């Protein structure tokens, strides 16, 4: 008689995976989590101290960066990417991350691989000061090839209604501060995989795949600290669509545009290499973060102090542009 295992789904391996995963998830739990993993749903109590609490949610994945991870069997950092992509998005509205859930899909489940993926998720949650309260691992033979994995996540944060960052006070003359990225982050990998045919080729003394699997930077701690001290008017997470798509998302008014000085900071070597190999500059700014992973909009008289504060926290940051009256979109010059 045909069994589920013979159909390609190994329930015992699933149980073993859950056992390994639980140990990582436990390390992320805050006092606000009301139950552990294994229930039908995760429950989180809202923290005290919020007058009009608003929940802010975001979901994302890692895209085809996972193809490189699968080919090189290096899975312990892409979970960090997954968390970063979600929490950096909700951070743009001033939200402090509360909890996170993940979704892993594969063709054939290997408990050690799913454990490595969740290890990264847990690391990202700890860095983001949020709890991993649940998730789903789906073994789907026929939908995915053996050895292929995918991961996505869902983050929820909290902010007081009167402290939501929505760009409503941004005006002409305000300045833009860019916080450095850790590398390519998690966007543009379909293009990258076309450019770098040989993932083992040398890049500054290491294989290019190692550089490409550098995890996405999480900006939660430095940005939440800034929000307590400065009037941050708008924020943007530079993800898919690069500068051209993401920076205008911080604006809520028509009649304003963004000017970026591309010479205001040193573009990292990985992006220079992509241009050397044939990717045009405009395409680069329309696809990648170009070394700037997160952008803040502040009053001109706060620029120096914000840069000092970021430096104290170990962040590389630069004044990269300004808000302009008239026009639309982004001008890079």
UniProtKB/Swiss-Prot annotation:
**Keyword Cytoplasm attached:** yes
**HAMAP family hit by this protein:** AIRS
Q: Which family does it belong to?
A: Belongs to the AIR synthase family.
Q: Name one Pfam family in it.
A: AIRS
Q: Which enzyme class?
A: ligase
Cite the EC number.
6.3.3.1
Question: What is this protein's record name?
Answer: Phosphoribosylformylglycinamidine cyclo-ligase
- The gene behind this protein is purM
Locations listed in the record: Cytoplasm
Domain of life where this protein originates:
Bacteria
Organism listed in the record: Clostridium perfringens (strain ATCC 13124 / DSM 756 / JCM 1290 / NCIMB 6125 / NCTC 8237 / Type A)
Q: In which pathway does it act?
A: Purine metabolism; IMP biosynthesis via de novo pathway; 5-amino-1-(5-phospho-D-ribosyl)imidazole from N(2)-formyl-N(1)-(5-phospho-D-ribosyl)glycinamide: step 2/2
Gene3D superfamilies in alphabetical order? PurM-like C-terminal domain, PurM-like, N-terminal domain
* CDD domains in the cross-refs: PurM (cd02196)
């Amino acid at each position: 008689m045909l069994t589920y295992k013979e159909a390609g789904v190994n329930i015992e391996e699933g149980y073993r995976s859950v056992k390994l995963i639980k140990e990582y998830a436990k390390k992320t739990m805050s006092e606000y989590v009301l139950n552990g993993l294994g229930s039908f749903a995760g429950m989180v109590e809202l923290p005290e101290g919020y007058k009009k609490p608003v929940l802010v949610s975001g979901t994302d994945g890692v895209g085809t960066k996972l193809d490189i991870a699968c080919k090189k069997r290096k899975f312990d950092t892409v979970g960090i990417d997954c968390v970063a992509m979600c929490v950096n998005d909700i951070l743009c509205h001033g939200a402090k991350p509360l909890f996170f859930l993940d979704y892993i899909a594969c063709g054939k489940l290997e408990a050690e691989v799913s454990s490595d993926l969740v290890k990264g998720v847990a690391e990202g949650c700890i860095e983001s000061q949020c709890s991993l309260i649940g998730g789903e691992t789906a073994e789907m033979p026929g939908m995915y090839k053996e050895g292929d994995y995918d991961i996505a996540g869902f983050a929820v944060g909290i902010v007081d209604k009167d402290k939501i960052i929505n760009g409503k006070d941004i005006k002409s003359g305000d300045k833009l501060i860019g916080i450095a990225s850790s590398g390519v982050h998690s966007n543009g990998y379909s293009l990258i995989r076309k450019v770098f045919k040989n993932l083992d080729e040398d890049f500054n003394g290491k294989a290019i795949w190692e550089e490409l699997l550098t995890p996405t930077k999480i900006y939660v701690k430095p940005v939440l600290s800034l929000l307590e001290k400065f009037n941050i008017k708008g924020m943007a997470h530079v993800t898919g669509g690069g500068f051209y798509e993401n920076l205008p998302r911080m604006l809520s008014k028509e009649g304003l545009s963004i000017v970026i000085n591309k010479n205001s900071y040193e573009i990292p070597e990985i992006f220079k290499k992509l241009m050397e190999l044939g990717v045009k500059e405009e395409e680069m700014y329309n696809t990648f973060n170009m070394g700037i992973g997160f952008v803040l909009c502040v009053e001109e008289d706060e620029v120096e102090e914000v840069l000092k504060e970021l430096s104290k926290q170990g962040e590389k940051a630069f004044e990269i542009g300004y808000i302009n009256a008239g026009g639309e979109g982004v001008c890079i010059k």
